[in-house]
């Protein structure tokens, strides 16, 4: 199922961890799919239009998968409101951040690092107020 011009649902439900643990990571409600489509249209597609292809490393997570990867108990990934974006380099990540901060719809924008690996967590709420939180986290 196509969520926007360049993003399909399978990019957001694909998970090596789910496959390894035998967890079926599929959206369980229309709301989750609508939330992912909103995230794509308002945040990810504009980023892709500006910079070319981007890689989603984590999108939708059903609760069992979210627990298995150590996600927060109230993670927006479980509602289809969030995605983690692979960063090919720190410089490219800084370009992504600068652009994402200019978008009119943004709930959270988090620069995350675990050792030498960095990624950006981005979220947008289709319903409710977007907080425009900017943070960084070192795991």
Where are the model-predicted features located?
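Extracytoplasmic cell-surface/polysaccharide-interacting catalytic and binding patches
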Residues: 1-48, 136-139
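N-terminal start-of-chain detector that recognizes signal peptides
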Residues: 27-28, 54-60, 91-96
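Catalytic cores and adjacent binding grooves of peptidoglycan-active enzymes
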Residues: 74, 79, 87-139
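Short connector loops at helix/strand junctions that flank enzyme active sites
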Residues: 51, 78-82
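Extended, low-complexity, intrinsically disordered C-terminal regulatory tails
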Residues: 41-70
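Amphipathic alpha-helical interface surfaces
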Residues: 32, 36-43, 65, 81, ...
């Amino acid at each position: 199922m196509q969520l926007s011009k360049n993003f399909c649902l399978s990019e957001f439900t694909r998970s090596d961890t789910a496959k390894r643990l035998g967890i079926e990571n599929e959206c369980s409600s229309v709301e989750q799919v609508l939330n992912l489509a909103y995230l794509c249209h308002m945040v990810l597609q504009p980023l892709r239009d500006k910079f070319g292809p981007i890689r989603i490393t984590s999108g939708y997570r059903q609760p069992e998968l979210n627990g298995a990867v150590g996600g927060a108990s109230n993670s927006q990934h479980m509602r289809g409101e969030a995605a983690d974006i692979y960063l090919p380099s720190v410089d490219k990540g800084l370009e992504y951040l600068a652009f994402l901060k200019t978008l009119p719809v943004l709930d959270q924008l988090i620069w995350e690092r675990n050792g030498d690996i960095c990624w950006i967590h981005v979220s947008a709420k289709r319903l409710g107020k977007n907080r425009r939180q900017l943070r960084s986290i070192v795991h």
